[in-house]
């Protein structure tokens, strides 16, 4: 499986798109739009009759994880903070503030939905926090 790993401070840009940046203050020239980054790796287009019909971007066999943390950290520290929150056996310098995982047979990129989950709404609760966003998919 291949992996897309985005990390940074989560916010919405002026177009209300979810982005991650390395500073708390947004910088649209450097920061990454999550949906645009996913579209770069999506290779499958499917026909649809929804709305006006046409073709939509779709990633089969997708698995997504989001770690939300109170401060800048690497992925290992983010995972450690979740373990610490659940079991109290790890000592980390950051505090886990949220975790979500979705394993469904496909990700609809334009709608930003996986299964019946609206990822825009799901990720809204992490706005303003440092996140590690991981999408694993088959090539």
Predicted regions and their residues:
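Short beta-rich binding modules
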Residues: 2-125, 130, 135-139
């Amino acid at each position: 499986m291949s992996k897309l790993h985005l990390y940074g401070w989560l916010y919405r840009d002026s177009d209300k798109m979810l982005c991650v940046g390395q500073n708390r203050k947004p910088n649209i020239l450097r920061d990454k739009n999550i949906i645009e980054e996913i579209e770069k790796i999506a290779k499958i287009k499917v026909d649809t009759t929804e709305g006006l019909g046409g073709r939509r971007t779709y990633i089969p066999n997708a698995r997504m994880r989001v770690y939300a943390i109170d401060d800048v950290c690497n992925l290992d520290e983010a995972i450690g903070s979740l373990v610490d929150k659940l079991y109290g056996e790890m000592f980390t310098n950051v505090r886990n503030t949220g975790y979500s995982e979705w394993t469904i047979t496909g990700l609809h990129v334009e709608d930003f939905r996986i299964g019946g989950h609206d990822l825009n709404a799901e990720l809204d609760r992490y706005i303003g926090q440092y996140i590690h966003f991981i999408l694993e998919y088959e090539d």
